[in-house]
C-alpha cells in the first residue's frame, strides 16, 4: 500500500494502534511529520510514548496500522529508512568498558561514517579532557552526553530521541535545543519525548502529540 502524502512529509503514521497488557495505549493514531518539524510526544507515564517511538523507528510492530517513510511502508524500504534514521533510546547505548572516544568512534563507524574528528565532536558536548576516560567511570550526565555526541556528526534526516535531556544540565539542554532547531532548519525533523520544559524551542515552533491510555 502506498500512502499519498505531502512532498515535504518525511514520516507519517496511519491508524496506529498499540495494546499492552489489555491497555489501549493509543488507537488509530494518524499524523504526518514534515521536514522542518520538531515534535514532542506527550502523555503520562505508561501512556505509550516509548512504544510509539519504537514503532516509528521500526523496532516494534503496532497492533494495527502502518508507518510510512515518505510514501513507502517502512517495512518495505527498511534499508533506505535506516540510512535516514537516527534513533536514541532512553538507555544510553554506551559501553562501560570503552572510553568516551572509543564509544563515539564505534557508533559513528557502524553508522557508516569514516571521516570524523572524535576529539572535536566530544568538545561540542563538553567532554574535552574525558576522551580517554572509561564510560563506566563517567557521571550520569557525561555518560548521556557521550551517547548524544553522535548527533553532532550525522546526516540522517529523521531523529527519534527518547528522553534526550535525561541527566543533562540546563546549558546542555539549551545546546541540544539549538542543535534540534538547526537540524530542522536544514530540512530534517526531530521527534522526542521529555519531561523537561524547553526554553529555546517555543510553542509556535514545537508540535505536540498527546497520548492517553485506556483499558480494553
Curated annotation (Swiss-Prot):
Recall the GO molecular function terms of this protein's record: ABC-type heme transporter activity; ATP binding; ATP hydrolysis activity
The UniProt entry, under Gene3D superfamilies, shows:
P-loop containing nucleotide triphosphate hydrolases
Q: Which GO terms describe its cellular component?
A: plasma membrane
Q: Name one GO biological process term.
A: cytochrome complex assembly
Where in the numbering of this chain does the ABC transporter domain appear?
A: 5-216
Alphabetical list of PROSITE patterns matching this protein: ABC_TRANSPORTER_2, CCMA
Q: What are the UniProt keywords, alphabetically? A: ATP-binding, Cell inner membrane, Cell membrane, Cytochrome c-type biogenesis, Membrane, Nucleotide-binding, Translocase, Transport
Q: According to the UniProt entry, what is the EC number of this protein?
A: 7.6.2.5
Tell where it localizes. Answer: Cell inner membrane
SUPFAM superfamilies (alphabetical): P-loop containing nucleoside triphosphate hydrolases
Which residues of this UniProt protein bind ATP?
43-50
Please list the reactions this protein catalyses. Answer: heme b(in) + ATP + H2O = heme b(out) + ADP + phosphate + H(+)
What is the enzyme's main class? translocase
Main site of residence? Answer: membrane
UniProt membrane topology term? Peripheral membrane protein
InterPro entries associated with the record: AAA+_ATPase, ABC_transporter-like_ATP-bd, ABC_transptr_haem_export_CcmA, P-loop_NTPase
PANTHER family according to UniProt: ABC TRANSPORTER I FAMILY MEMBER 1
Per the record, the similarity remark reads: Belongs to the ABC transporter superfamily. CcmA exporter (TC 3.A.1.107) family.
Check the record and name the NCBIfam families matching this protein.
Answer: ccmA, PRK13538.1
Protein task: Part of the ABC transporter complex CcmAB involved in the biogenesis of c-type cytochromes; once thought to export heme, this seems not to be the case, but its exact role is uncertain. Responsible for energy coupling to the transport system.
Its assembly, as annotated, is: The complex is composed of two ATP-binding proteins (CcmA) and two transmembrane proteins (CcmB).
Protein name as annotated = Cytochrome c biogenesis ATP-binding export protein CcmA
From the UniProt record, report the name of the gene that encodes this protein: ccmA
